[in-house]
Amino acid sequence: MRGSRQTTQKPDFPARAAPRGGSLRRLDEMITTCRACPRLVAWREEAARVKRRAFREWEYWARPVPGFGPSDAPLAIVGLAPAAHGGNRTGRIFTGDPSGDALYAALYDVGLASRPTATHRGDGLELYGVRITVPVHCAPPDNRPTTGERDTCRPWLARELQLLRPTLRAIVVLGAFAWQALPPVLAEAGWRLPRPRPVFGHGTEVLLAPAGDGRPLRLVGGYHPSRRNMSTRTLTPVMLRDVLRRGAEAGGLLTSPHHGGPGA
């Protein structure tokens, strides 16, 4: 953890350049070149060398995984980090792993995705009014980034939300890690934080006022659709769809089940 924090002080700390990302496309390109956290770089590349048997024919992405979705989205979804054999393999967040299977099926069910499955970057999947991102863009060992790695990655997420700010009206926050990571990011991106800070819980809602010009932002907390949460029924498909619908409503998206996009 200490090493990751020291990394942020180096002149070549890649995320220092995040404010120069003038568009989400450019920011995504910049993110994919980052090698700031030695532990994460080693792990993502090791996972690509020692592949799971089911994916031995794959050429793994093995780089930081950027956000996915339109640049004018009124709704964002913030998760945790790419999975070693999911996003780290396919190059798209929540794609190719059980968490993504649950999330994209739910997004499709509420009318926010063009298809219920996500298998690879060229599968034709589109999101309607939603952008998905994470506080940590590299796959971490045991799906557990350190706080230092989270802080090193923070400028990327802050800049992404700044670029989304003209249209962003709501964020669905999946899991306690993302909930805890967001306050300094949101403050930097232009919203006021309530005091005391709200405690994470499934279904928790918080309305943030803008720090200056702009519109307020509603946060909707939800359990992360991890394999464990889904298998133990800590989170069910119905519960996941509910928080996504609430986020969509807060974002002004009129969802239409299954296909056609919002308002179809």
Question: Each predicted region: which residue ranges?
Answer:
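Low-complexity, intrinsically disordered or signal/transmembrane-proximal segments
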Residues: 6-9, 258-259
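Low-complexity, Gly/Ser/Thr/Pro-rich intrinsically disordered linker/tail segments
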Residues: 251-263
